[in-house]
A protein has these predicted regions:
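N-terminal prepro-regions of secreted/extracellular proteins
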Residues: 1-48
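Mature secreted bioactive peptide module from preproproteins
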Residues: 29-127
Length: 127
């Protein structure tokens, strides 16, 4: 009787470890950006490894007050784009949905425009 209980407990433990140990969390790559509008308006490229249909942008440094409008675009198929996410010194983080399915395993970049000239923003971008 005791042997049967131990076997059952061990089988349950092994099954739990197999299920829990085989799951791997999947994330999109996060890159730092430094853009100036007009001028250098593109972020570095970043790989998207998840299936979430939203991109994220966070500003960490603004050289002056203004709004930065950001859009995420698929590098190989520019028809795959996001809506605009806006950040400013008052609203440092934002996100926006993609208009169509943004597949994982591909590379994306962020393009920007601004409400004022010569706005320089540093921050992080996750496709």
């Amino acid at each position: 009787m005791m042997n049967k209980k131990i076997k059952r407990t061990l089988c349950g433990l092994v099954a739990s470890l197999c299920l829990g140990g085989s799951t791997v969390p999947v994330f999109a790559e996060t890159v730092d950006f430094d853009v100036t509008v007009p001028g250098d308006i593109l972020s570095p490229r970043a790989a998207k490894f998840d299936s979430e249909q939203r991109f994220y942008v966070t500003g960490t440094l603004f050289n002056k007050t203004g709004r930065l409008d950001c859009r995420s675009i698929n590098r190989t198929n520019s028809a795959i784009q996001s809506r605009i996410a806006s950040i400013s010194p008052s609203y440092l983080s934002s996100s926006a949905l993609y208009y169509s399915n943004a597949p994982s395993g591909q590379t994306y970049y962020m393009t920007t425009s601004a409400s004022v000239s010569y706005l320089r923003v540093k921050g992080r971008y996750t496709p």
